Swiss-Prot record:
Pfam families according to UniProt: KARI_C (PF01450), KARI_N (PF07991)
UniProt source species: Buchnera aphidicola subsp. Diuraphis noxia
Keyword list, A-Z: Amino-acid biosynthesis, Branched-chain amino acid biosynthesis, Magnesium, Metal-binding, NADP, Oxidoreductase, Repeat
Protein's gene: ilvC
Record-listed E.C. numbers: 1.1.1.86
Protein name, entry field: Ketol-acid reductoisomerase (NADP(+))
Length: 489
């Protein structure tokens, strides 16, 4: 049985609903509480390295604890840490003196890692996570004299660093584990950690471990990763069947997600739809409604399996089977026609991504709204649902622009990658069947700018702008004034 299922109904609801948008003044103390403290990050992968770089640049003392075998073999974590001039040591040499130990190893390693860390950590130390899976989905009891906190940036580690270097940050959830707040200082430490990664600049939600895990799993399985992967494969194949050049088709998809979702950062679904002509907007709206209708049951099934723990049980079983399903899905993805598509050296103008990508816009709108709606129906608060659907989407799209789906799956967590493939396996045949009957002007060429009915356009605009995710989005984006724009690929 996992931790979540040991809670009674009232406790489950209270933890799922915990969500408070924090005011800027709550970060006035900056990271003073962590200055001159010994902070040890365990693991130096994508999140570990990039959070550590930000924290060091914010004036903190950071070192990395790796397994002795990793140090002897000089594996990738050792290379990441030493190349960036961090102090590296084994658990026994660094953990006993650490004031804050941040566990940023892959989820599947957490049980064994935390078991070792607890034996070495001093009394009244803090143990940090950036994803609460190990706490919520497994019955993991932590020593009562250890304070357990979480700072969860809502994006891959690479984007945590890139946004920080731009002088901004990424939206972040912070939490203190109900069972482990020994010193009553957990929230203050979490705030200082979030400040040090730059999260305070983009907005921080005070949440719970439960709310973070359940919403995070839903977002990454559906719109953030699963829908992007499924749509990339299906849209590319459709473009090829309509006689588009493979290089052009690949580039339109690879860079199209990043270009189109850039508008989400600044003006939500409303701005994304406003980038289309009036006739294209109405067409995208109709397509999105159809996509929502046939996708609803799949989204709800994933949410139900996440809430019940069924998803986690199946994934943990795959871990025990040496990632048999995960590795098979990864191999299949690597060998898809989209991943193997040739380079295309001609420039695609920014507006062309919208004009030739009406279907892509429709898929994004449908997936964002459906993911958000399904989370809300399950008790997750609007702010959390926004962060885990619309807000993080441009940051995931950025990774596809670098090296297609390979890059996305390499930088997201092992848990996210598994959930992504699981969703895509079911969604792919459904979406593929749908696109058989779309118009050529829905993808790959532009829809003529025909005259439209004023009343129809007015009603479409009203429905777009009054969707609950747009209402909460306008509030949250008011905190995010300094976001930098991308260079169009």
């Amino acid at each position: 049985m996992n931790y979540f299922n040991t809670l009674n109904f009232r406790q489950k609801i209270n933890q799922i609903k915990k969500c408070r948008f924090m005011e800027k003044k709550e970060f006035n103390k900056k990271n003073e509480i962590l200055k001159n403290k010994k902070i040890v990050i365990v693991g130096c992968g994508s999140q570990g390295l990039n959070q550590g770089l930000n924290m060091r640049d914010s004036g903190l003392n950071i070192s990395y604890a790796l397994r002795k075998n990793s140090i002897l073999k000089k594996n990738q974590s050792w290379i990441n840490a030493t190349k960036n001039n961090f102090l590296v040591g084994d658990y026994e040499s660094l953990i006993p003196n650490a004031d804050l130990v941040i566990n940023l190893t892959p989820d599947k390693q957490h049980s064994n890692v935390v078991k070792e860390l607890q034996k070495l950590m001093k009394k009244d130390a803090c143990l940090g996570y950036s994803h609460g899976f190990n706490i919520v989905e497994k019955l993991r009891n932590i020593r009562k004299d250890i304070t357990v906190i979480m700072v969860a940036p809502k994006c891959p580690g690479t984007e945590v660093r890139e946004e920080y270097k731009r002088g901004f940050g990424v939206g972040t959830l912070i939490a203190v584990h109900n069972e482990n707040d020994y010193s009553n200082m957990g929230l203050e430490v979490a705030k200082a950690w979030a400040f040090s990664t730059g999260g305070h600049r983009a907005g921080v939600l005070e949440s719970s471990f439960v709310a973070e895990v359940k919403s995070d799993l839903m977002g990454e399985q559906t719109i953030l990763c699963g829908m992007l992967q499924t749509a990339s494969l299906v849209c590319y194949e459709k473009l090829i069947t309509t006689q588009n050049h493979p290089g052009y088709a690949g580039k339109l998809i690879q860079f199209g997600w990043e270009t189109i979702t850039e508008s989400l950062k600044h003006g939500g679904i409303t701005l994304m739809m406003d980038r289309l002509s009036n006739s294209s907007k109405i067409r995208a709206f109709k397509l999105s409604q159809e996509i929502k209708e046939f996708s609803q049951n799949l989204f709800q099934k994933h949410m139900d399996d996440i809430i019940s723990g069924d998803f986690s049980s199946k994934m943990i079983q795959d871990w025990k089977n040496k990632d048999q399903n995960l590795l098979n899905w990864r191999y299949k993805t690597k060998n898809t026609s989209f991943e193997q598509s040739p380079d295309y050296d001609k420039k695609i103008l920014e507006q062309e991504y919208y004009d030739h990508g009406i279907l892509m816009v429709a898929i994004l709108k449908a997936g964002i709204e459906l993911s958000f709606e399904t989370m809300i129906q399950s008790g997750i608060m609007e702010e959390s649902a926004y962060y885990e659907s619309l807000h993080e989407l441009p940051l995931i799209a950025n990774t596809i622009a670098r090296k297609k789906l390979y890059e996305m799956n390499m930088v997201i967590s092992d848990t996210a990658e598994y959930g992504n493939y699981l969703f895509s396996e079911s969604a792919y045949p459904i979406l593929k069947e749908f696109v058989k009957n779309i118009n050529n002007t829905d993808l790959g060429s532009a829809l003529p700018r025909n005259s439209v009915n004023n009343i129809e356009l007015y009603n479409v605009n009203t429905m777009i702008r009054n969707h609950p995710i747009e209402i909460i989005g306008r509030k949250l984006r008011s905190y995010m004034k300094n976001m930098k724009t991308i260079i169009v690929g």
